[in-house]
Amino acid sequence: MACALLGLLCLGAVQPGGILIRSAHVFDGTGAPAGLADVLISGDRIEAVGRGLRARRGVRIIDARGMTLMPGLHDLHTHLRSPGLGGPDDLGKAYAAHLIHGVTTAVDFSVSGEMLAPIREMTESGAVSAPRLQLAIRLGVPGGHGTERGWGDFFTMEAPTPAAAELAMNRALAYRPDAIKVFADGWRYGRVPDLNSMNVPTLRAIVVRAHAAGIPVITHTVTLEGAKVAASAGVDALGHGIGDAIVDDELIALMRASGTAYVPTMAVYEPQQDRSFLPAELRLLAPPERAREEARLARPLDPIPELETRRWAILIENLRRLKAGGVRIGIGTDAGIGGVYQGSSAVREVRLFTQFGFTSAQALAAATSVSAGILRQGADRGRIAAGQRADLFLVAGRPDRRIEDLYEVRRVFLAGREVALAPLRRLLDSDEFTPLPAHRMAGPIDTGARTDGRTDLDTLPVATNEAGIDHSRLHFTREGGRLVLVARMGAAARPFASLVLPLTRGAVQLADARGFAGIAFEARGTGRYALALESYAINARDFFRADFGGGTTMREVRIPFDQFRSADPAARLDLARLRAVIFRLEGEPGGQVSLELGNIRFYR
């Protein structure tokens, strides 16, 4: 049975008498040599560390002879809603992959503000097992990286000036994010024309607001000049490697003065054409990941483009120089980007560090205490010491001496509670998607009854469009309870703009519309329109959709569910797995299309 179906059984109960881990090689996360010791856990904290600790009544004893106890690993750069090999999102499997690799803290850059509350609700309740999530809200500049995928300003909030940054941060902080991600650097690696970048005053305005709220700022920074901008603005970390030029003394001095750390995400830049996998590493991958890599390894090697070879050499040298210069360096991977797999990539990143000038102990410290410090949480977690949070894992062997032993995870603890790893492994090996909480639909979707801009379902309507900097733009307002949409089409050959009405907050959890016959609404407009159903476990390009027409006057449109079609002939419409309804406006490049909508509802 999938771990998610078991709820809190995937996270063991708090032991009333505590947990005593005996005779482990304890790597405390600081980089100091591991030593034999016992560790006593009480509640969610480490109570004591030492030799010969006494076992009080009711304590659970774990014999850790031959094993190493470590603080949980961090991944400071993930996209948990992306699986790393294409396909629909499966948060439960992404979370599971991190836990089985000993990653107890993951920073997620793949969410929008509306997603934070429902994700926290289902993970903190135990409905879906997860590491300690640090959910980030994204900011960027118009025409910059992060804004070109067609996901809308709600997903990457745009801030071209310090004043706009203040407004964007007002919106962002209302969602209580754990971190702020800023797409500050527009270099696209020389493959395509550069995008726009953020200036120092705007970035500094974001940093000041975030730090006042106790929140770290991590930037998408990939160039030497962009790194100087970020360090001058006082960001907590550069969230990628500098790949265009060798770092200079000026940057090192700026980073040391501002306390800006370096999270180079070497795993995403490592040329994949000739990369190899250790047997233990390959064994721990999910079946589709393993199949992809085995198929690649069975083929003749593809050539590595000269651009990638040159960038990789620069990244390696910059990692060495920044380490030698005394800059703090943490672990992040960009997990979820093609071929950078959830969970396993964090261990691979640690291994890569040991190939480029780090000892095993230094690389492990980067993944534990240093990364916790980058998140401004070093006083609370990231080390094995009395008073620290008990996010820990046990590994067979001595990874502080032989880094490959890091794949031999035996036990994982989150806040002092042991994680059941076997159900998580079964979940990863299953073809099924993780069960998520579902909400029964009552009928109304957006009838105009609310006056706060939200739908009847208390969700926020948002605009999306085709990818590209020259994309379409949708503006919508409410007039007399109706939604009025006006789209200015972009320069793409087949431009479109869409209004997304989430059926649950952030379209994360599921909507159950079983028992209804279809969707009805009132519409007026003379353009080309379609209604699509965003569904769990289906790729966006394959969402079920039905075309519809409008007219010069408002009229009711009813679309039965059996009229919706998918581009994937194998796809099946599951009315218990809906997430959003999407009204799509299509037109000619540079044209304008409008649509008026009202009384949107499921009908029986």
Please report, for each region that a protein language model flagged, where it lies by residue.
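Bacterial Sec-dependent signal peptides at the C-terminal "C-region" and cleavage site
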Residues: 7-18
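Histidine-rich, glycine-flanked metal-binding segment
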Residues: 17, 26, 30-70
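Histidine-centered divalent metal-coordination motifs
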Residues: 23, 67, 74-81, 220, ...
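Divalent-metal coordination cores built from histidine and acidic residues
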Residues: 68-69, 73-76, 90-217, 250-297
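Histidine/acidic-residue-rich catalytic or RNA/ligand-binding cores of hydrolases
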Residues: 84-86, 116, 227-234, 268-285, ...
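His/Asp/Glu-enriched, well-ordered alpha-helical/loop segment
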Residues: 212, 299-306, 311-398
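C-terminal cap of metal-dependent C-N hydrolases
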Residues: 389-429
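Beta-rich carbohydrate-recognition modules and glycan-binding surfaces
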Residues: 433-604
